[in-house]
């Protein structure tokens, strides 16, 4: 029986096989944030000298990449990337996700938007029929905390401030429990339209293109329909 850590490693290795397919001196790889992304970063070290560089979705990931001797580029200097690789807190069969447990949701969305394909890596426990058991992170401009919290409460959520946490952008996170997420793209737009919200941790309007889910029987690959 593989442990969860071993499953995460398996998912990271599957993504590294995709990097092998696209690697080249002009290639830039987008890299996410979190425990599974950390394993991907560690494996990416073997491509040192075979890539132009990487773009990181957080200061944490940038430091880990640099520690392996991989170039970390400013997104403003990058026009496109073949793939962006990141984990998920939850993912459904439509490849909609909840992300942001590590607090990097805004930069994750931004970096992912520049990649041609979004590759989600996770262990099979993250696959759910409907999103919402994991509290939904929402990045909020500090002065709008209470106003946004009231708006989230009107949507049926129970927002709680993530104590002692500040995002790389200098903002706060509200973690919202109790939401019924039957229409993930619709809810993502509704929450993002609340004044003071930077973005929410729903990745549904632009979800993953491919999910590589590690199971006890190997990698299960899901691809976005249509």
UniProtKB/Swiss-Prot annotation:
Pfam families xrefs: Rib_5-P_isom_A
Pathway field: Carbohydrate degradation; pentose phosphate pathway; D-ribose 5-phosphate from D-ribulose 5-phosphate (non-oxidative stage): step 1/1
Known catalytic reactions: aldehydo-D-ribose 5-phosphate = D-ribulose 5-phosphate
Keywords: Isomerase
EC number of the protein: 5.3.1.6
GO MF entries: ribose-5-phosphate isomerase activity
Binding site for substrate: 33-36, 86-89, 99-102, 126
Active site: residue positions: 108 (proton acceptor)
GO cellular component: cytosol
Keyword Glycoprotein: no
GO biological-process terms attached to the record: D-ribose metabolic process; pentose-phosphate shunt, non-oxidative branch
Enzyme class, spelled out: isomerase
Xref: InterPro entries: NagB/RpiA_transferase-like, Ribose5P_isomerase_typA_subgr, Ribose5P_isomerase_type_A
Family: Belongs to the ribose 5-phosphate isomerase family.
Role noted for this protein: Catalyzes the reversible conversion of ribose-5-phosphate to ribulose 5-phosphate.
Subunit structure and binding partners: Homodimer.
Protein name, per record: Ribose-5-phosphate isomerase A
Source organism of this protein record: Bordetella bronchiseptica (strain ATCC BAA-588 / NCTC 13252 / RB50) (Alcaligenes bronchisepticus)
Gene: rpiA
């Amino acid at each position: 029986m593989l442990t969860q850590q071993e499953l995460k490693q398996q998912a990271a290795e599957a993504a590294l096989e995709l990097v092998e397919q696209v690697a080249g001196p002009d290639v830039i790889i987008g890299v996410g944030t979190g425990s599974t992304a950390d394993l991907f970063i560690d494996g990416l070290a073997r491509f040192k000298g075979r890539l132009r560089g990487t773009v990181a979705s957080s200061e944490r990931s940038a430091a880990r990449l640099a520690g392996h001797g991989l170039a970390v580029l400013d997104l403003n200097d990058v026009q496109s990337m073949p793939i962006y690789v990141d984990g998920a807190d939850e993912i459904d069969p439509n490849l909609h996700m909840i992300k942001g447990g590590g607090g990097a949701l805004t930069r994750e969305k931004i970096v992912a938007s520049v990649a041609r394909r979004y590759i989600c890596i996770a262990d099979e426990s993250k696959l759910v029929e409907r999103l919402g058991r994991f509290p939904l992170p929402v990045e909020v401009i500090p002065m709008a905390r209470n106003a946004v919290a009231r708006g989230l409460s009107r949507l049926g959520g129970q927002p709680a401030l993530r104590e002692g946490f500040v995002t790389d952008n200098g903002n706060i996170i509200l973690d919202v429990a109790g939401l019924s997420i039957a229409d993930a793209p619709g809810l993502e737009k509704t929450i993002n339209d609340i004044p003071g919200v930077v973005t929410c941790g729903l990745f549904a309007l632009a979800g993953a293109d491919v999910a590589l889910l590690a199971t006890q029987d190997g990698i299960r690959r899901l691809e976005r329909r249509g």
